[in-house]
């Protein structure tokens, strides 16, 4: 009988704490639009003002030159990145670094051989000797 009363008292205290801490405090409650507008206008006045300055001719010319340099460097980089189209390989061989599991044909490169790893689950054509 004493154990059940102790258990019920503990449960009652837990529920009281849970209900007290589940509700937000009064200052965290949602406010209406009027109070939000008044608070936002007060907060904006606290920040320093932003000044806008006109650019002189020299700074405009420098910025234009920098922009042109960036454009030309981007064009050069795009020209350098153009990849050569791959030549189609003949069908009865496997290209270097491609999968070459045992039913596949031999490697196209005469210096390459088929290497398998992880109990022949991952096989690829690799060049073993550079002197070939």
Swiss-Prot record:
It comes from the Eukaryota. The keyword RNA-binding does not apply. Residues 60-88 are annotated as: Disordered. One of its GO terms (molecular function) is neuropeptide hormone activity. Residues 1-22 form the signal peptide. Keywords: Disulfide bond, Glycoprotein, Knottin, Secreted, Signal. It is found in: Secreted. Residues 63-79 have a biased composition (Basic and acidic residues). The keyword Signal applies. Its main location: secreted. One of its GO terms (biological process) is melanin biosynthetic process. SMART domains: Agouti (SM00792). Residues 93-132 form the Agouti domain. GO terms for cellular component: extracellular space. Disulfide bonds join 93-108, 100-114, 107-125, 111-132, 116-123. Glycans are attached at residue 39. PANTHER family: AGOUTI RELATED (PTHR16551), AGOUTI-SIGNALING PROTEIN (PTHR16551:SF1). Involved in the regulation of melanogenesis. The binding of ASP to MC1R precludes alpha-MSH initiated signaling and thus blocks production of cAMP, leading to a down-regulation of eumelanogenesis (brown/black pigment) and thus increasing synthesis of pheomelanin (yellow/red pigment). The presence of a 'disulfide through disulfide knot' structurally defines this protein as a knottin. This is Agouti-signaling protein. It comes from Macaca cyclopis.
